Structure formats: C-alpha cells, structure tokens
Amino acid sequence: MKKYLLSFAMVVMGSALVTSCISDDDSDKGGSSSKISVTSGLYVVNNGTWGQNNGSLTYFDYESLQTQQLLSGASGLGDTPNDAFTKGDTIFVVGSTENTIFVVNKKDFSIIKRISTVEGMGEAEGYTPRHITGYGNNIYFTTYGGYVGIIDAKTLSMSQIKYKVGSAPEGLTVGGTAGDPVLYVANSDYGYGNASISKITLSSGTVEEIKDEKIQNPQEIVAIGNELYILDWGHYTEDYSRQLDAGLYYYYNGNVTPLVEDATGLGVGMVYVNNMVVGYLLATFSAPYGSASAPTYNLYDTYKRLKYPLNLTGDSGKEIVSPAAIAVDPVRGNIVIASRSKDPDTGYPSYTLPGFANMYTSSGEYVNNTHFQTGVEPHMIGFTFTTQTISY
C-alpha cells in the first residue's frame, strides 16, 4: 500500500491533546507518562503598509497569554513580509519586497540570517519571493520571477537547483507518495487568464503543467497524495469593482469541483481518528472584494468530504471586522482569525492601523482571553510547537 503524503501533516506528528492555559483539562493524574507534541504559541506575519517598512511579526504565547510585537522596521522584516514556515527551532519568513528569506530563531525571535533570493537565484529569477514550504531537508519558495528556489535547512545556503514554473506563482505544497514526492505550485498569472498548477516530480526534477478553465487565479494549495485543494481568487469585473468566482476547489484526475463558494481565505488543520491523521480540516472565510454581504466562515472535512458552516459566537465587543488571515491549530483544532481594525474616522476597515486576532473553537465559540493586537495588515498565521511529558 502506498503511503500518501499530506503536505501539512509533516509539520506536527503525535496526539491531538494540548495542555496549556487555554486547555480544558489541567489535571495531573500521576502514574505512567508519555511525550506529546503540543502547540506552544502562534505567530502572525504582518504585511505592514507598502513602502513604510513596518512589516512585523506578532507572537501570542499559549501559556502566558501574552503578546509580543517583533521584528518591525528596516532592521527587522522590512517591507511586506508575506509568508512563513516553521521547521524545528527555526522560522523561515518570506520578505517579498526585500527579496529576502529571513531565518528567525523561534526561541528568541532574533534574525539568524538574511538570504537574498536575487543573489542566490539571479535578478530575473529570484525577485519578489512569495510563499514557502518544506519537505525533508529542503525549504522551497516561489518567486514572481516564475521559479521555485531551494534552501538547505541545515546549512542555510541556497541550492543551485531551481525549477521553472508558471506565471506569478503563489502557494506551494508537497504531495504524491513517500516514495515519489511531488511539489505542486499555484501559478496565479496575476489573475490575467493564464493560470495553472505546476507539478514538480522531486526525484527527477520534471515539471508538468495542469490547466483548467475553472482554475483562474490560484493562491494557496494543499495536497493529499495527488488530490488537490485549491484556494482560487477567481476574477474581477471589467471595472474592478467586484470579485467573482472565488472559492475553494477540489482537483483530482483532471476534474475540478467547487467546494466552498466565494472563499478568499484558507487555513489548514488536521482531522484525527484514534490519534491518527486521516485528512485535513480546511477553514475558509468568504469575503470577496466588492461584496455587500457580511463575511461567512466554513469548515471542510476532507476525510468525511463534508462542509460545515462556522458561526462565530461569544466575541461581543471584539467581533471580526474584515478577515485578513485564518488558520487552524493542527494539534488542538482551534480556529484563529486575524482581522483588520475599523477606522474610527471612516467606519471602514483600515489598511494602516494595527489589526487584531481572535481564537475560536471548531464549533465557532470564542475562546476566552485569546483576543490580541497584531501589526498592520495581518496576512498569515503560523504555529510553534514543543514537546511535553504528561502523566496518567
């Protein structure tokens, strides 16, 4: 039997149990003990305001429930950090405008190294890095030069190997099987009509292109084997007043099926059965540009192949204003949503004021004491993990 890869399942292995200040059970029963992987906190990558050098990282600690605002300014993450990937004690942060991958120490959030993508790949190939993931000892990232670059996670050096993909690549993910891993890349073409998915067979370096008229502007992608779940931003009306056909789509064996209408944000968690990862829990928000409707939220279980509405409750006075990022704690299953703040002068969402984030259970109930401020324009949410010993 082939062992199919779940692209995000490689980040966290182990039990779904979490012990922390926001846990439901703090008891110590004594007796035997075992080690489990737990979520120690979460970080938010904040774009900042373009041209203002105020991109930053916000860290929320699960134990203390305290927040730190980190790495802001030109000496930090600079202008427009866009994505991040955690591997062990290291966070790799993508600096799009800076043409840099920032290597950050997870323990003290100091910058260990700045890796220039244009120096490592070439001016034309390495400009504007966008998204990042990892597999084995390699860190993979996309660039608007139309390439996927590779960093050695141990030596923190740029590989000479790079893969030519489609136009304006965004998110990427690892799928296939353990014996034949495949890197899938979402090529957006900036929404101009020539979008595609690149399929890179890592053992040979062969690059194939997948095209379908329903794939118009793919932004994020996750895989179970060779089954793909694609967040697509669709297209805009001629006057750019409205966004149309955005959504979460399922691709397999040449067929594209819509799953969540109007979805514009995606977070990826795990589905567990008997402490075994069996699929994804995909959290989405639907807030297409120009829509007069309030944002909606959904969960999609890839194991049961079912969609559930996520109705947010219990957050009176700190309701989500304009969702900007969503994530699922892969161990506990809580949903984290980052939002823009409301401008007190205009009453509209602000792109220049600090945002905020809330945590909710998978049934949509606000988790007490988890409302915290972020930097300007929160864009991506990641998690940090540690190992704990529990007694029972």
How would you label these PLM feature ranges?
Residues 157-292:
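Acidic, serine/threonine- and glycine-rich low-complexity intrinsically disordered segments
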Residues 258-353, 359:
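Intrinsically disordered, low-complexity segments enriched in Gly and acidic/Ser/Thr residues
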Residues 1-42:
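Bacterial Sec-dependent N-terminal signal peptides
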Residues 44-52, 93-97, 141-145, 183-192, ...:
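Conserved beta-strand positions in repeat-built beta-propeller and related beta-rich domains
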Residues 78-86, 123-134, 167-176, 214-225, ...:
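Repeated scaffold domains used in trafficking and secretory/extracellular systems
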Residues 68-133:
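Blade-loop segments of beta-propeller domains
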Residues 65-76, 110-123, 157-163, 205-212, ...:
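A short beta-strand motif characteristic of beta-propeller blades
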Residues 38-42, 88-90, 136-138, 179-181, ...:
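Short coil/turn segments that connect the beta-strands within blades of beta-propeller domains
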